[in-house]
């Protein structure tokens, strides 16, 4: 990030809250997806990159961690050195494959790939893609079991 404060954005521009955090605290809470994380019911595949100039990287991590703590079905893809939109061809191809696998699993009932069921350890990033399909229970089946057990 640039190191500049982003408060002006919320007070005067894109978010249109029209006041400071201290003047309108409820509007800031309502504007933040973090405070609605407990209401997320749809599986989420998010991409947030470390060079994103539009949204601070820590906000993506914060939201991802909140959803994981709430045991929501969420995956976060990070392409190191990339900004808000992907520029490197290999990363665009990787994102396309992962989106297809994600939607094939949740919309067509296909088996989940390894990257969704077991994840990819950081030390294997770029080496082991995890595209192969998992054996055993799918993510969807595990999520259904978790939901049943909560009731």
What would you call each of these model-derived segments?
Residues 1-151:
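Active-site-proximal cap/loop segments of hydrolase catalytic domains
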């Amino acid at each position: 990030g640039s190191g500049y404060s982003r408060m002006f954005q919320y007070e005067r521009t894109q978010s249109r809250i029209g006041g400071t955090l201290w003047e309108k605290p409820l509007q800031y809470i309502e504007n933040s997806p973090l405070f609605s994380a407990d209401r997320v019911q749809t599986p989420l595949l998010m991409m947030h990159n470390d060079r994103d100039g539009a949204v601070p990287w820590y906000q993506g991590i914060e939201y991802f961690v909140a959803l994981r703590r709430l045991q929501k079905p969420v995956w976060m893809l990070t392409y190191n050195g990339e900004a808000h939109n992907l520029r490197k061809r290999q990363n665009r191809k990787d994102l396309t494959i992962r989106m297809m696998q994600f939607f094939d699993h949740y919309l067509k009932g296909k088996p989940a790939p390894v990257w969704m069921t077991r994840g990819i350890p950081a030390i294997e990033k770029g080496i082991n893609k995890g595209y192969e399909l998992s054996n055993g229970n799918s993510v969807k089946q595990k999520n259904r079991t978790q939901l049943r057990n909560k009731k």
